[in-house]
């Protein structure tokens, strides 16, 4: 699993962290997308930074292909499984697409099992902010995920950049170990439906 760090107050001091896709390589202007719902501003920033970005969030709840740079992989946030259709449209137009699983239950109307079953894309666990969510992302073998600083500790601890870097290294070591559901011999004998 490859982890990403989106924009946060410490991001300038975390540019040298290895093993993560660090903002702006992972572009996720949550303020423009979620709070302001200012897609024009987001698109302008996307085009302006297109040579620095590897992966970006595709604007939520947009069911058509926007004029976005083609050199970037897009995480399409899936709030309802029918929104996988926009991922299909993007792929048909030669965009690199990753399906985004909404970690917060209030932003989706499906289970993680339904998402894994329905998605034919690489999968991204959006907004990993608890140990439970990290374990879940590893268990279900997500390809990518972005973590929030809340995963690393309390607010007072997060003021210490060295503490944050140490915790990021610990998480990277945990993620680099193999995870997922353990197969049993019975898995090989169950007849497919």
Language model feature labels by segment:
Residues 102-105, 129, 138-168:
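Glycine-rich phosphate-binding active-site loops on the catalytic face of alpha/beta enzymes
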Residues 84-90, 106-114, 134-136, 153-162:
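Short, charged, surface-exposed secondary-structure boundary motifs
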Residues 84-89, 122-123, 129-144:
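Catalytic cores of alpha/beta
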Residues 51-53, 94-95, 142:
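A structural motif
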Residues 96-125, 133-135:
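Donor nucleotide-activated moiety binding/catalytic core segment of transferases
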Residues 76-107:
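Histidine/lysine/aspartate-rich catalytic loop segments that bind and position anionic ligands
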Residues 1-70, 119, 155-193:
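Non-catalytic, usually N-terminal nucleic-acid engagement modules in DNA/RNA processing proteins
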Residues 4-8, 21-26, 56-59, 75-79, ...:
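A cross-family glycoside hydrolase active-site/sugar-binding cleft signature
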């Amino acid at each position: 699993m490859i982890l990403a760090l989106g924009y946060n107050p410490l991001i300038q001091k975390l540019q040298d962290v290895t093993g993560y896709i660090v903002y702006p390589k992972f572009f996720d202007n949550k303020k423009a997308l979620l709070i302001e719902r200012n897609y024009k501003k987001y698109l302008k920033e996307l085009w302006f930074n297109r040579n620095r970005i590897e992966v970006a969030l595709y604007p939520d709840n947009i069911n058509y292909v926007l004029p976005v740079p083609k050199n970037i992989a897009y995480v399409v946030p899936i709030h309802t499984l029918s929104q996988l259709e926009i991922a299909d449209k993007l792929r048909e137009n030669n965009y690199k697409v990753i399906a985004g699983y909404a970690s917060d239950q209030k932003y989706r109307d499906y289970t993680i099992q339904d998402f894994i079953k329905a998605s034919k894309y690489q999968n991204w666990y959006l907004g990993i902010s608890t140990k439970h969510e990290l374990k879940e992302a590893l268990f279900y073998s997500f390809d990518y995920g972005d973590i929030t600083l809340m995963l690393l500790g309390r607010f007072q601890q997060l003021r210490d950049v060295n503490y944050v870097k140490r915790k990021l290294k610990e998480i990277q070591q945990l993620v680099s170990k193999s995870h997922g559901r353990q197969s049993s011999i019975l898995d090989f004998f169950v007849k497919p439906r």
